[in-house]
Amino acid sequence: MRCLPVFIILLVLSASAPSVDARPKNEDDVSLASFHDNAQRTLQRLLNKRSCCPNNPACCH
């Protein structure tokens, strides 16, 4: 029973705390999807070079 008031206080404090979404977005915020797209593009480029280079070294530039 002694923990109940502490639990209630923590519950009220956590409910009144600002969420992460409350902070304003700025131009430095980049979505995770764009990072994923960049990673996919880089991986695809590396795979293309890997399959191309043994057959034609000129395409490895």
From Swiss-Prot:
Which GO terms of the cellular component aspect does the record hold?
A: extracellular region
Any GO molecular function = toxin activity
Main subcellular localization, coarse class?
A: secreted
> What are the alphabetically sorted keywords of the record?
Cleavage on pair of basic residues, Disulfide bond, Secreted, Signal, Toxin
Q: Where is this chain's protein located in or outside the cell?
A: Secreted
- Spell out the residue numbers of the propeptide: 23-48
On tissue specificity, the annotation reads: Expressed by the venom duct.
Q: Which residues form the signal peptide?
A: 1-22
Reproduce the UniProt comment on modification after translation: Contains 2 disulfide bonds that can be either 'C1-C3, C2-C4' or 'C1-C4, C2-C3', since these disulfide connectivities have been observed for conotoxins with cysteine framework V (for examples, see AC P0DQQ7 and AC P81755).
Coiled-coil residue spans: none
**Which Pfam families does the UniProt record give?**
Chi-conotoxin
**What is said about the domains?**
The cysteine framework is V (CC-CC).
What protein family does this chain belong to? Belongs to the conotoxin T superfamily.
Protein name per the record:
Conotoxin Vn-05
Q: Which organism is it from?
A: Conus ventricosus
